[in-house]
Amino acid sequence: MVMEDEPREATIKPSYWLDACEDISCDLIDDLVSEFDPSSVAVNESTDENGVINDFFGGIDHILDSIKNGGGLPNNGVSDTNSQINEVTVTPQVIAKETVKENGLQKNGGKRDEFSKEEGDKDRKRARVCSYQSERSNLSGRGHVNNSREGDRFMNRKRTRNWDEAGNNKKKRECNNYRRDGRDREVRGYWERDKVGSNELVYRSGTWEADHERDVKKVSGGNRECDVKAEENKSKPEERKEKVVEEQARRYQLDVLEQAKAKNTIAFLETGAGKTLIAILLIKSVHKDLMSQNRKMLSVFLVPKVPLVYQQAEVIRNQTCFQVGHYCGEMGQDFWDSRRWQREFESKQVLVMTAQILLNILRHSIIRMETIDLLILDECHHAVKKHPYSLVMSEFYHTTPKDKRPAIFGMTASPVNLKGVSSQVDCAIKIRNLETKLDSTVCTIKDRKELEKHVPMPSEIVVEYDKAATMWSLHETIKQMIAAVEEAAQASSRKSKWQFMGARDAGAKDELRQVYGVSERTESDGAANLIHKLRAINYTLAELGQWCAYKVGQSFLSALQSDERVNFQVDVKFQESYLSEVVSLLQCELLEGAAAEKVAAEVGKPENGNAHDEMEEGELPDDPVVSGGEHVDEVIGAAVADGKVTPKVQSLIKLLLKYQHTADFRAIVFVERVVAALVLPKVFAELPSLSFIRCASMIGHNNSQEMKSSQMQDTISKFRDGHVTLLVATSVAEEGLDIRQCNVVMRFDLAKTVLAYIQSRGRARKPGSDYILMVERGNVSHAAFLRNARNSEETLRKEAIERTDLSHLKDTSRLISIDAVPGTVYKVEATGAMVSLNSAVGLVHFYCSQLPGDRYAILRPEFSMEKHEKPGGHTEYSCRLQLPCNAPFEILEGPVCSSMRLAQQAVCLAACKKLHEMGAFTDMLLPDKGSGQDAEKADQDDEGEPVPGTARHREFYPEGVADVLKGEWVSSGKEVCESSKLFHLYMYNVRCVDFGSSKDPFLSEVSEFAILFGNELDAEVLSMSMDLYVARAMITKASLAFKGSLDITENQLSSLKKFHVRLMSIVLDVDVEPSTTPWDPAKAYLFVPVTDNTSMEPIKGINWELVEKITKTTAWDNPLQRARPDVYLGTNERTLGGDRREYGFGKLRHNIVFGQKSHPTYGIRGAVASFDVVRASGLLPVRDAFEKEVEEDLSKGKLMMADGCMVAEDLIGKIVTAAHSGKRFYVDSICYDMSAETSFPRKEGYLGPLEYNTYADYYKQKYGVDLNCKQQPLIKGRGVSYCKNLLSPRFEQSGESETVLDKTYYVFLPPELCVVHPLSGSLIRGAQRLPSIMRRVESMLLAVQLKNLISYPIPTSKILEALTAASCQETFCYERAELLGDAYLKWVVSRFLFLKYPQKHEGQLTRMRQQMVSNMVLYQFALVKGLQSYIQADRFAPSRWSAPGVPPVFDEDTKDGGSSFFDEEQKPVSEENSDVFEDGEMEDGELEGDLSSYRVLSSKTLADVVEALIGVYYVEGGKIAANHLMKWIGIHVEDDPDEVDGTLKNVNVPESVLKSIDFVGLERALKYEFKEKGLLVEAITHASRPSSGVSCYQRLEFVGDAVLDHLITRHLFFTYTSLPPGRLTDLRAAAVNNENFARVAVKHKLHLYLRHGSSALEKQIREFVKEVQTESSKPGFNSFGLGDCKAPKVLGDIVESIAGAIFLDSGKDTTAAWKVFQPLLQPMVTPETLPMHPVRELQERCQQQAEGLEYKASRSGNTATVEVFIDGVQVGVAQNPQKKMAQKLAARNALAALKEKEIAESKEKHINNGNAGEDQGENENGNKKNGHQPFTRQTLNDICLRKNWPMPSYRCVKEGGPAHAKRFTFGVRVNTSDRGWTDECIGEPMPSVKKAKDSAAVLLLELLNKTFS
């Protein structure tokens, strides 16, 4: 307890946190914190009421202190001794409490297995503690000093290749450092801005994260219980699941199971009898048998309908431990390839799917029947006729050898799926047929007592209703409309009725939808859709009444008017006119009846109201609710009397009213038609008496108003949970739907089959349920059906038990027989894939749907029948198939067959065979998308890792070194001998072309060097001239010159190597001794000094005198000359959590550094090391000895330095090291007019009191140094900068004035604090240029080496340009060449594919091109050729440059040969890191050893380099050179000249078509005359044009697109040679885009010659032409594709197709094509006329100003609305039918609004400044308008520097939001010297990290102002 009269600081022990943290791993510290049990600490004076030490970090200090001293864990928290650590136990109650606290579970929710896991974690932590203590005891036993720190062991850990992971680890370490920083004070609260009240700074207890999480939980608290339950379910043991399932089985279920184990079985049991449980038990039995054979099980569970997929899969998952996969059509399995399916088969044990999916993958040989172990068929009675169940069995099961067939288990509530059975024999025949089909035996229950006990049957109630009065006039009117539509459709198509409805009558459309999920929504369906809608209205009129029919018609009309797609259908007006007429007719009739007032009120709504809100597909519009005063019976009664609602509907409503007070009411109403299911809930919603009902519809997939699976699942879930109490459903809900809460089932429409009767009854699962059958009074057929259904059910049950003997049956034709030989099929022997007559029609439709097309084209097969009359009146048929014009063939005649259906199947089967033979089908009999065998390369990463070829995919690659630099001679020289070797001396010449405005003499006082190589360099390297950016406005050129060859002895070589190491260790700030330097033979060259006389012979040109002087001097014995500046200066706040003074002392003493370290900078003002520490280290002479010589030496003109006396004038030009700060300075002059007693200068702009009186006072107060020689003149010096990258322009982006830029900053130093450096200033300045020069030389040598590999002569400098990325920030990069290479590669590959594959359509060609030119493929090519070793991708950093004999700074602390005293006890890496990598093996992506020779490259960079190489070779050597390079890379695109002739020969156009085209006008517009007219015809023919033997333009568009792209890119590249790559890319994008080409087509009237057959396209073209004409009327306006009207893509396509046609017609002459198109494309975009897309302009503006940009889009009917928000404030909005156009307009409006706002603010600021007078004069310095200083992080940093505090500590407390509108929230605190750590201040969420830190800094400044004021 802290005494009141004693300061708090006095009660806290000195913390050992720093010492412990620096030689104890972060993992161990975390373990100790977690092991520290507060409950075990006795409550005493030093603890609070909870038993926790008041100063938490003091308690941790106690633990760490004990560990460091070898005493183990202290006895007051964890344990007494080492041996007791493993005996520490924690009670389960405590663990359970902690688990509840962390996971949010219930208090009793902990499980025993969780205890063991947590105890295991604690054991591992204790093991690490023991290991650490053992290590410490070993070290201390050897006599090492206790307070010495161990080197950072974790620098040796293996590095992963995943760059993102490295970043994450860095963040974790920073987080750990942040936690350490809080050692002095426990965090008890935080400060933030009051968001509700006065916006003042408010204090809150706790942590920001906890408060924020609590707020979030308040919002989502309702879901907590569900989460807990889900967690509990996950924690259930697997054995428990198995046992529960076994215990649930009833005796009759086990009986059926035993039979199913013995043989194939069909379980014939009532709904709710538990058939699924039997299937689950059977799956487990099969799995157990296979496990005994070490085989994996694959069971397939088939269901007939989509809802059952989800239901059954969930049941199996809950009841078993198997991996279960579920599959239905909406999941897109039709487009899965075999590899995706194989992954599913390997990872799953049970597959639940619809039968059609299994049939598909069997037919395409993705799976084989013999690989399935168990096949379960739910509702197996469907296995009749052509149902997928039946086809699976007949086509695949029965054709598989018996010993390889899977076991079969069928489940059904009725084995007969017909209207009923006429007799016992009839029933027996139907059951036998099902058994034969499924190769199984029906099994049912003989004793039904147990079944009746567990499966209660609902009460069956029959309700009669009166027959509805027929509305003859309305019915006849609608029928006449239907007939008129059919007649109009027949007339327009000029086809027979079969042809118009042929696909539908032949069943192709239904099969197509079921088999491949293709939904035919095209223009020609308009008439059929209208007929369907009129028939639905007519049905509703008859069955539900006029009121409902009006609602249906109104909904159809509303949906048609608001559907965006109708704009592109040819007969929109046609449909709208008919529907409007019907709605008007029904409306008039309603106005005359009892509901006239209601309808009139409804009709009288304003047109701009919400009567026609946007609806989901398949929904009806909501209508207003009837006023509460009306009684339902009065409304319905009046409606029935007037014929507006049928008695059937009235009876249904009365039935529902009877259940008004029924508890937990849940009902299903079954209807026959979808339209009834949709309209009845709307009727119920309008009746107030049915307000107790919450109603929803449930419809299936096979209709025009289909319901998505997700919607269906949502509806079922709501019904199960009670959010929906009434389902109006079609037959989709009859089978298998398991809703145990359902207590009422109503058959609004009587079932059509016995099965439907039984199945729908089974939906009433709750005991005491009602099954209500509504029958028409007096309807004989209804009564007969009910009798037949009841009798048939009993007959079926009896037959299943008694088994009638059919051996004496005379008519055996009714019994089916299964033929093991498949019927007429086409089978691919290579894969086993097959197509039969049953699947051929659907496959042809699927193929057509995959052909490339647009919304205007109708891509589906057309069939025409021909009758063949045979003698005897028999008629046969043959079918003619016509495929779309972009298929490999168009017409195919089929064989003569007995029926139209069979004829259609036969011709489709023949078409499938032919398509496969022509390559349109793969060997899996799926449409070939152009993938081929290369598809394997394009596989996606299933684990979510970045895909190769993208910028996010990064890898480590070894840095390349040219072979010419390699030499073993650098490793010699250890033994002194006189033998000599031949070397080559190269002098580097640096000449200043122009000094500019610089007058600095230092820039010209530079020593020269030469470079010694073991091999001769290439001549191109010597001819290279490089720019060095030494100073602003100074132009410096550097080059190499060969000076000759010379022999050097081993002794001389040894001296040169020592000189080289001494020189580079200073230049690169690396402390290294020449004797311990490792020399890499990969870099064999040396830097040597040269004499002024360059005309001497090479051996005499070396300055041997300087070499001897530098290598023999004793000055190097002083560590101050070797130590890097960071010894004293330290680094940023993330370097260490401790005292930087101790850091500096440790660096001096032991040459080791603890903790994380980053490269130091001079950006931190002021020194941080105490001079006393330096003096105490013994590294400086005793300064007392100086006093005796001071007077004598000063009189001789000498200066007393820290290391002796020196003549003052000799110091000029030297380098001195400041002992008090460790910094180095060039000596500019000696200031004889200044001394230590000179007044210390006042800071510029500072008006306060002087901080220091004299220089002596400054050094005394700042560094604690008493100067002895205060009368000595001061040394004027300038800082020695770090070695910089001189290859990058560093002075262009500064916005400061020239005066500021040219200003040199000097310091004035007392000589007695300076040590003279052995190396002169001119020598260092010259040497600092060497790294940059060698970087360029090394890069150039690599380029020469690559050039030799490619073996084609082009300038090496161009190859270097292609290898240099923009990230290098040099004066050249590959981006311009990459742009040209990309276009050239695309053109060459497109030409090659077009000519080589004349049968491939445009979609296939596009995919094949993508596989040849994609970044992933180019990346793989680059790896094969080793380009990763030649690429320059990083900005050159000398500190990371690996000079010969000098390791880089980056790996300073992990290098060999260091002087650490821990080196005696080195452990293997695998042993040290055993806590991280338990197996001791390197993980994928990790690298061992030194990482300095590795660099990170993205795979996109490698791909870009390939394109850049193609570009430079094309520029320098034309097509021949580019093609040579592509061939070397691996891209083979050589084409045969004869292929062009073959292509032209394939263009055969009928004479009638040629005569219909105005070639003269079109060729006049193009100014080109075609030799082959057929190419021009094809180029202007759209796919919507009815086929006339002419292909569409798609293939020509494919090649023309590449031709124009290449030609325009080439034109821009060579026209604007100095344009930056980014601007060149923008120019290309503006010139090469479909919108621009479309305007070219309109400008030259090419659209007038377009051959198409779409009225919607014609309409859109007219609108676009009008818009372009309006644009053209504006003087000087050219949108270059950025106009306000989006062009039809077809117009741009024909420009590209015509370009392709000209290219082919001219014999592949691109010059001819450019000659035609250059004038057509005028005016061409230029840098001056280049428009910027508003979206991009706004994005860039927001990025520059760090503002959050967000777009919000919504759609209402046919209009899209896009809103623009900046920092949450709306700044723009626009509406357009097209979303992208609306976004562009909204961005444009936002930009205009922002500009207006800026102008207004500028004016207001001008007015305010004018009125403010002189008081506001300070604003010119950047202050805010109110005169207050704008606080930022820099303000806080300045305060910390003045107060001598550590830098503030920031942390990100939250990062969230979408990618385009991220928000960052930061916290900050600072460690004050006298009061410890401040509370954390949390800033506001900001769109950038900088602004977020600024926001937090402002709060902390306010807090500091309050605290210290």
Swiss-Prot record:
Chain intervals for the UniProt region annotation (Disordered): 99-177, 929-952, 1801-1831
Any one GO biological process: ta-siRNA processing
Membrane spanning stretches: none
Sites marked Important for activity: K1689
Gene Ontology cellular component terms for the protein in this record: nucleus
Residue ranges annotated as motif DECH box: 378-381
Domain Helicase ATP-binding intervals: 256-433
UniProt domain Helicase C-terminal: residue ranges: 651-812
Gene3D superfamilies cross-referenced by the UniProt entry: 3.30.160.20, Dicer dimerisation domain, P-loop containing nucleotide triphosphate hydrolases, paz domain, Ribonuclease III domain
Consequence of gene disruption: Embryonic lethality in sus-1 mutant. Weaker mutant (caf-1) also exists. Mutant caf-1 produces extra whorls of stamens, indefinite number of carpels and show an absence of axillary inflorescence meristems and abnormally shaped leaves and floral organs.
DRBM domain sequence ranges: 1733-1796, 1831-1906
EC number: 3.1.26.-
Comp. bias (Basic and acidic residues): 110-124, 147-177
Disulfide bonds: none
RNase III domain boundaries: 1342-1518, 1559-1707
Domain Dicer dsRNA-binding fold: 840-935
Record keywords, A-Z: ATP-binding, Endonuclease, Helicase, Hydrolase, Magnesium, Manganese, Metal-binding, Nuclease, Nucleotide-binding, Nucleus, Repeat, RNA-binding, RNA-mediated gene silencing
Domain spans labelled PAZ: 1189-1318
Note: Expression in the early embryo is from the maternally contributed genome.
Chain's role: Ribonuclease (RNase) III involved in RNA-mediated post-transcriptional gene silencing (PTGS). Functions in the microRNAs (miRNAs) biogenesis pathway by cleaving primary miRNAs (pri-miRNAs) and precursor miRNAs (pre-miRNAs). Functions with DRB1/HYL1 and SERRATE proteins for accurate pri-miRNAs to miRNAs processing. Indirectly involved in the production of trans-acting small interfering RNAs (ta-siRNAs) derived from the TAS1, TAS2 or TAS3 endogenous transcripts by participating in the production of their initiating miRNAs.
Quaternary assembly: Interacts (via N-terminus) with DDL. Interacts (via DRBM domains) with DRB1, DRB2 and DRB5. May interact with AGO1 or AGO10 through their common PAZ domains.
Entry protein name: Endoribonuclease Dicer homolog 1
Protein species of origin: Arabidopsis thaliana
Name of the gene encoding the protein in the UniProt record: DCL1
